[in-house]
């Protein structure tokens, strides 16, 4: 889990737009965040396997 201070800092509106960055809405992780879902790759995988994300399924070819 991310530090609460860093999560709060990321939620504040930055002075300049380029200073803003994405964090996972579930765990607060700052890297590998999918904007469409607002989740990091780890949380996205866990929720997809649990069937909590509608329309997402494991690919097979």
From Swiss-Prot:
UniProt cross-references to Gene3D superfamilies, sorted A to Z: 30s Ribosomal Protein S14, Chain N
GO BP term (any one): translation
UniProt keyword annotation of Zinc present: yes
GO cellular component: cytoplasm; small ribosomal subunit
Molecular-function GO term, any one: zinc ion binding
Binding site for Zn(2+): 24, 27, 40, 43
InterPro entries in alphabetical order: Ribosomal_uS14, Ribosomal_uS14_bact, Ribosomal_uS14_CS, Ribosomal_uS14_sf
PROSITE patterns tied to this protein: RIBOSOMAL_S14 (PS00527)
Stated name of the protein: Small ribosomal subunit protein uS14B
Protein species of origin: Mycolicibacterium vanbaalenii (strain DSM 7251 / JCM 13017 / BCRC 16820 / KCTC 9966 / NRRL B-24157 / PYR-1)
């Amino acid at each position: 889990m991310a530090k609460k201070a860093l999560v709060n800092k990321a939620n504040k509106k930055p002075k300049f737009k380029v200073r803003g960055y994405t964090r996972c809405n579930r765990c607060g992780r700052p890297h590998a965040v999918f904007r469409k879902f607002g989740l990091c790759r780890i949380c996205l995988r866990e929720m997809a396997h649990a069937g909590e994300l509608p329309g997402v399924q494991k690919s097979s070819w």
